[in-house]
Amino acid sequence: MTKIVNSWNEWDPLKHVIVGRADNCCIPPAEPATDPKIPEGSDMQDVHGPRSEESIDKANIQLDNFSRLLEKRGIKVDRPTPLDFNQKIATPDWENGSMFGCMPPRDVIITLGNEMLEATMSYRSRWFEYLCYRPLLESYFNIDPEMKMESAPKPRLTNESYRENYLSEDISIDERLEMVAKKEFVTTEREILFDAADILRMGKDLFVQHGFTTNLKGSDWLGRHFENHRIHTLNFPGDPYPIHIDATFTPLKPGLIINNPTRPLPNEQRDIFERNDWHIIDAAQPAHNEPPPLCYSSIWLSMNVLVLDPKTVCVEESEVYQCEQISDLGFEVVPVPFRDAYPFGGALHCATTDVYREGKMEDYFPIQ
């Protein structure tokens, strides 16, 4: 029997992974879910259309280099099949001027045990993105008799799924933070919504960020679907744009997490970690004062690292402070040039999704 799919956490030895591509990537036109994500003064405002061939080529050079680096370490690498993202898409409820891309598979696919699950996604522009990964998932399904290929309920993403005029230009940053603290986000509870990158896998326990891209119904659905697991919903009030957990809260090995110091986990949500002797420490400061041009993400992609095993971590090579911190914590740091790929969907964790890690499901939080 050929075993292809197995991954229970973020740190066991990685043996097989999907690395994204930048081909055909677009900046989609405005839609209800994306407007609140773009910070004031960002060069992303009012910009949409295909990304330049020059920027795509630079990103692909770094993605290809990353893939070769992983392969040299004995890790099998698969790549998605890009679509023509620069085309209009539609459902019976809406139409959108273009799609996004397939650089960040972590957003779309979550692997848990022998299952690979397609997330609902919360952007209209990303509704069809799962198609880029279907050929790979189908091949795993055909080879591995125990692999489960699943898809969460596709959302309609009508206007009822979003708060109207959320975070208008008249709202100050303090007011934005107050709304986030109250857990008032752009997405409503109209239907089940979650992005896979809002989920951290820690054996029997899954930690899910409630924010712009995952709602409480999404967390509830995950708990019902993964019925042998425990779901914990987290939120980080210091983040005015809470999208995806992996530039905020990053486990490096059992018992150790780095936390974005500008988005600290609230004290009342720390209990489960403290009861089980987990240490949450502030991540190092980013090496850059600004993200690259036309980048959705913040400078905190510095902590968006890929753990290869409990002793080895890939870090973007220019993020010297994060490299130094992780080295001082006792890890081998593998520096990876990746900043040209940031604008296409994130850093090293975003750009990958697990297929196979050694290990089995363990209970890292026995004291609930």
Residue ranges and their predicted role:
Residues M1-Q368:
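The feature marks the mature, well-folded catalytic cores of soluble enzymes
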